[in-house]
Amino acid sequence: MHNLIFAILCSVAVSVLLKIARKKNIIIEQAIAFNYITAITFSYFLLKPDFKGLEFTDYIAQSENSPIFLALGLLLPSVFIIMSKAVEFAGIVRSDAAQRLSLFLPILAAFLIFHETLSQSKIIGVVLAFIGLFCLLTKPTQGQSAVNFKGVLGLIGVWFGYGIIDILFKQVAKSGGAFPATLFISFSLAACVMFIYLFLKRVQWTSSSVIGGIVLGVLNFFNILFYIKAHQSFAGNPTLVFAGMNIGVICLGTITGALVFKERISKLNWLGIIFSLSAIFCLYYLDKIIA
């Protein structure tokens, strides 16, 4: 459970950093690009990926995990770009809701792809998790206009993209000792995609964005690392990790927003936190209690 807790803490720290970055004139796109450089560095020196004596390109061509790191390398930066467009055309509240509700896809995958046993406690836990998410994501939307076609496409892209990334990280966890190489290559490809995108936009690079990206990369790397290790620790219970990570981040994020940024927590939001904690309890403890 400690890996999941560390992953949640790092994820919330990433969110806090991104929120502060917008106020410090850090260009998020540039920070994301250099975040991947940091992640590549940590992957290489801390995880020590084993390329089986092959050249980098040969390993990519021959590895059975090629579809995973190719998909991650493309999706990680692409979903960020899609998220920024969704925020632009549909608003941050709707975009955040789409990201959190993407939990539906990995939960579905847990039973259909990863063949997790569907028990009564898991059904109760999943239902409580979605009720909790609904309560936590219900916020005032005054002043928001109707969503146009571009906004709808952006929200669908966010929902689908984040859901698929969660499923892919579970697949990375299943690769066992090969996951360091998979992460290293995924981050490398993601960096290439992001830098190409920024160079095509002909951006003016800023030192504050580079520094912010380095800090972001440290937090993001450990967020992903602990998330994968959580999946490895609970190999037979992916629902716990998928739901625990998602609702854990939004619960802690909501409380952090209130304490640090003086954001208001409504009674419905507090109810959502209670439902969410109950969901984690059911997913982790209820089967053991019944047994």
Curated annotation (Swiss-Prot):
<feature type="domain" description="EamA">
    <location>
        <begin position="107"/>
        <end position="138"/>
    </location>
</feature>
<feature type="transmembrane region" description="Helical">
    <location>
        <begin position="26"/>
        <end position="46"/>
    </location>
</feature>
<feature type="transmembrane region" description="Helical">
    <location>
        <begin position="270"/>
        <end position="290"/>
    </location>
</feature>
<feature type="transmembrane region" description="Helical">
    <location>
        <begin position="179"/>
        <end position="199"/>
    </location>
</feature>
<dbReference type="GO" id="GO:0016020">
    <property type="term" value="C:membrane"/>
</dbReference>
<keyword id="KW-1133">Transmembrane helix</keyword>
<feature type="transmembrane region" description="Helical">
    <location>
        <begin position="241"/>
        <end position="261"/>
    </location>
</feature>
<keyword id="KW-0472">Membrane</keyword>
<feature type="transmembrane region" description="Helical">
    <location>
        <begin position="1"/>
        <end position="21"/>
    </location>
</feature>
<feature type="transmembrane region" description="Helical">
    <location>
        <begin position="117"/>
        <end position="137"/>
    </location>
</feature>
<protein>
    <recommendedName>
        <fullName>Uncharacterized protein HI_1376</fullName>
    </recommendedName>
</protein>
<keyword id="KW-0812">Transmembrane</keyword>
<feature type="transmembrane region" description="Helical">
    <location>
        <begin position="208"/>
        <end position="228"/>
    </location>
</feature>
<feature type="transmembrane region" description="Helical">
    <location>
        <begin position="95"/>
        <end position="115"/>
    </location>
</feature>
<dbReference type="GO" id="GO:0005886">
    <property type="term" value="C:plasma membrane"/>
</dbReference>
<keyword id="KW-1003">Cell membrane</keyword>
<feature type="transmembrane region" description="Helical">
    <location>
        <begin position="149"/>
        <end position="169"/>
    </location>
</feature>
<feature type="transmembrane region" description="Helical">
    <location>
        <begin position="67"/>
        <end position="87"/>
    </location>
</feature>
